[in-house]
Amino acid sequence: MSILTKNKIINTNFFYLLILGLFSFFVNLYYAKLGSFPIDTFLHYDSAYRILNDELPVRDYWIVSGLAVDLIQSFFFKIFGTNWFAYSLHASFFNCLITIFVYIFLTNIKISKLKAFIFSISFSLLSYTISGTPFVDLHATYFLLIATLLIINNLGRQKNYLWFFITFLIFLSFFSKQVPVTYAILVYSIVLLLFFIKNRDFKKISIIFFSIIFHMILLIFVLKINKIEFGNFYIQYLDYPKSIGSSRLNNFEFAINSFFNKYKFIIIPLFLLIFLKLKKSKIFSEESIGHLIFVIFTIILIFHQLMTKNQIFIYFLIPIIFGLLEQEIYTSKYKYKKYISIFMILILAFITTKYHLRYNENKKFHELTNIQLEKKIKAEKIHKNLRGLYWKNPHYEGSPSDEVLILNKAQKIIYSNKEHEIMLISHYKFLDSITKKKMNYPSKTFTMDGASIPLTSNKHYNYYKNFLKNKIKKNNINKVFFFKHEKIPFKIITNYIEKNCYNITEDEIFYVLELKCFK
């Protein structure tokens, strides 16, 4: 190959990577600003800000997932300030990163750069852009995706240092959210162990084993220096979330028609890929094991999606599966493979447009579908740090202007309590940072479905009850505020303290629990 040809390939690659990086970054940045679903949109906002102020998860507030996401977001806040730009920048950077990884993966499996570029553009529209802001399920899934693609690309290579990095990504996925990576660890371990033993590649097994030991020691060290007791970490991040998963599994209902309708554009090409691969590959070849791992990854994500209560976020699998199908067609002897490839790209364009309109333009992931987004207003009217966001909350029944007025009045009431420690129970998880007043949120979310905190029937009820009481005493909290219009039940607090330890008052904006018995 001539130097001129090599330079041309490098220039083409650089051009595609540059366009992909810019497109995936700015498309996420754009759609992040359209509307707000506070309970999800701001899930990591104040919790990341609290880390910068030495309020740590597990130790200072109850957490069941999102440790890694909060820590990464606090890093963005540290560099760029605590504001909306730094918040959406985090997700936009992540969308850029995973899009580039997908492009590199596709070119590594010998897909033409142009087609890899097309598949990656589709991926960038269907991945983080559907949320636009940091979200636990997405971070957990995409860390696992990168790890999975690296595993597939490095099964037969001798770049053993990458297995340390893969293990690190698995840990990041777990500390973003415990699932789906827990399922992947169980199944991947069996497949990879059998593959490495068959190929007598014991060095990779050793590297993975010692990488796991290293990261576990690192975890214990981090907990120790931050004065987080391992027992508390175990209950909040390991044992309690396991009980949530068990409950959902016991109440799981499956409807075949609904299932196929939602996932048909994943299931059909996946079955076609499996059929083509079984026809031509040896069972234990690197290529077959790589495809098996991706099929396992896809099945795990479908199962995880069925178990979670969130909107569907796994349509990003479609362009990757189409990319793998393109590889099969390219290496086949089909007479009309060129036309089949073009037809596939047209189908993918249709699917991408369909879900782009539904999830990006209509913001379905944050439940803004059929909400009049044209009535949105600038969130900087709430506070200058929210500049760049357009406010429209699907769970507020009035106009955005009315809600902003309530939030501005709420800030004044909070300021009037500057001399006292208060606790706020709210889905508006940005008030801590914009008021510079500690809201002392006892947990990251406030739902009564058992996913936020232990209910009275849960075995960890007494543990959380003591956790909440200790927090109230330690911080000398004498008032707990609830926004009237949010209608969050008082049980979030009253289920965990005695009836004679509070009185309920109200003003124009809040219901207030005035606490006694905790001095």
Language-model-detected regions and their locations in the chain:
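Extracytoplasmic
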Residues: V179-P180, K227, A349-F518
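Short acidic/glycine- and proline-prone juxtamembrane loop motifs at membrane-interface regions
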Residues: I130-A140
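Extracytoplasmic catalytic/substrate-binding loops of multi-pass membrane glycan-assembly enzymes
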Residues: A32-S47, P57-F75, T82-F85, N226, ...
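Transmembrane-helix motifs of polytopic, lipid-linked glycan transferases
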Residues: L89-K110, I146
